[in-house]
Amino acid sequence: MMLSIIEYKAACKKTIIFLEEAGFILNKDEKNRIQVVEYGLDNLELIGLQLVEYINTERCCAKELVLFRRQTCPEHRHPEINGKLGKEETFRCRKGIVYLYVEGIPTLNIHAKLPIGKEHTFTVFHEIVLKPGDQYTIMPNTRHWFQAGEDGAIISEFSTKSIDEKDIYTDKEIIADCNRIVEENI
């Protein structure tokens, strides 16, 4: 199911306020291009994210990822595409706490709260806790997922070219490119 225009506008407004309260300045064009991603699961409050993409060329990409309280970006990986390595990305926490999970030795007693009914779609549990100023680089084709802490979070993402619709999700119910931009200048 897709977000309604009203839900999309509300998420965009909340995203703008969250970014501005943290000292980020968005121009009108950036505000009009906010992407709201709910993955076709109709549960944006728990599984989804909001983002502003500044640039995405053949060589680089820069975005701000906004997650509200306990919002989760589901487990996925960035595969090889047409013989080229998948996306390599660096997450830098700007606000809040981010619980990032990657392949590796599982952490006992993780901080994240798995979305009820979707527990089986999370398989990697090596925890990296990012606080403002911390960063972590995720290599291509590495399974990962992340969740904001109690106060939400802002993550600056710096990466190679982003082709989000080619990401591979552990949860087969996910629609990779669902509700990114409902309508320009809404």
Describe each model-derived feature in a short phrase:
Residues M1-C61, I81, K118-H120, E184-I186:
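A short, N-terminal "cap"/entry segment at the start of jelly-roll beta-barrel domains
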Residues C60-A62, K87-E89, G152:
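Short, surface-exposed beta-edge/turn micro-motifs
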Residues E64-G86, P106-T107, V129-P132, P140:
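Conserved short histidine dyad/triad with adjacent acidic residue
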Residues F68-R69, G86-L108, A112-P115:
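Glycine- and acidic-residue-biased ligand/ion/polar-headgroup-sensing regions
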Residues P74-E75, V98-V102, E157:
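Short hydrophobic/aromatic-rich beta-strand segments that constitute the beta-sheet cores
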Residues T107-T123, R143-I186:
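Double-stranded beta-helix
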Residues F125-G149:
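Conserved metal-binding segment of the jelly-roll/cupin
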